[in-house]
Amino acid sequence: MRVVGGVLGGRRLETVSTDAIRPTSDRAREAIFNMLVSLELPDGARVLDLFAGSGALGIEALSRGAAHTTLVDSDAAACRTIAANLTALGISDRAKVIRSDVGRYLAAHGDPVDLAFADPPYRFDGWSDVLDTVNANVLVCESDREIEPGSNHAWQTHRVRRYGTPVVTLLVRRDSTGPRTALS
């Protein structure tokens, strides 16, 4: 696996050796960031990577101009891999790795971010809790199915794309405002 774009494009990422973690493919990550460009996220964006695994999505955001990324995963091996990737790429100072259950983390930390990624294991059934508690302007959900906001009127679906088995749902907060410049 590698960083697809930005200043770290082409650099290799270590992955976690466990069946519970399913890394986002290079192709899907590139497509996700192409979709995000149209939303003109702020330069220096604050990013939250939930169920971070190897940290590929959060690291990709840093490579493309995000100022800071918080990466959350409950798996100790995943957190060690993320920390090793950040160190190898020389970007540890722009990221924070937190070992925690995502639900507990979101309940305790409501700091706003510009962009959040949520890439839990397939068959995850806590999507409504994530939608209710994540404080982001844009939420990228990767799952085995489309994630619909349902009765949560804070979110609207911007795009849905399938990349083999994974389905990427891009949600935008209805009340998000503020100056926008591109996250390239």
Question: Where are the language model's segments positioned?
Answer:
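Class I S-adenosyl-L-methionine-dependent methyltransferase catalytic core
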Residues: 1-184
